[in-house]
Amino acid sequence: MGDVEKGKKVFVQKCAQCHTVENGGKHKVGPNLWGLFGRKTGQAEGFSYTDANKSKGIVWGEDTLMEYLENPKKYIPGTKMIFAGIKKKGERADLIAYLKSATS
């Protein structure tokens, strides 16, 4: 997949303002991402999701994240994630590699 260290930099630059990754981490504007892989959309306990996120019904994995992170509002219309997305596939792959290591 991608490079974990490069992915950590992407996370810090583009995601950490709204998300945490550690076990027991608090929700910010976006949900804590611990346990992300294998979890259905809209299921982080204690976070207030939109109906669009709750009803999307997909399971987060490398493929679904690759598509979602390119254009979140296209993948889940009605999401409250205000992030425009990451157009570079390599950057998305690095971020996903980091998320896989940091959230489990």
From Swiss-Prot:
Heme c binds at residues 15, 18-19, 81. Transmembrane segments: none annotated. The keyword Electron transport applies. Electron carrier protein. The oxidized form of the cytochrome c heme group can accept an electron from the heme group of the cytochrome c1 subunit of cytochrome reductase. Cytochrome c then transfers this electron to the cytochrome oxidase complex, the final protein carrier in the mitochondrial electron-transport chain. GO terms for biological process: mitochondrial electron transport, cytochrome c to oxygen; mitochondrial electron transport, ubiquinol to cytochrome c. GO terms for cellular component: mitochondrial intermembrane space. Its main location: mitochondrion. InterPro entries: Cyt_c-like_dom, Cyt_c-like_dom_sf, Cyt_c_1A/1B. Keywords: Acetylation, Electron transport, Heme, Iron, Metal-binding, Mitochondrion, Respiratory chain, Transport. The modification N-acetylglycine is found at residue 2. One of its GO terms (molecular function) is heme binding. It comes from the Eukaryota. This is Cytochrome c. It is found in: Mitochondrion intermembrane space. SUPFAM superfamilies: Cytochrome c. Belongs to the cytochrome c family. Binds 1 heme c group covalently per subunit. Gene3D superfamilies: Cytochrome c-like domain. It comes from Danio rerio (Zebrafish).
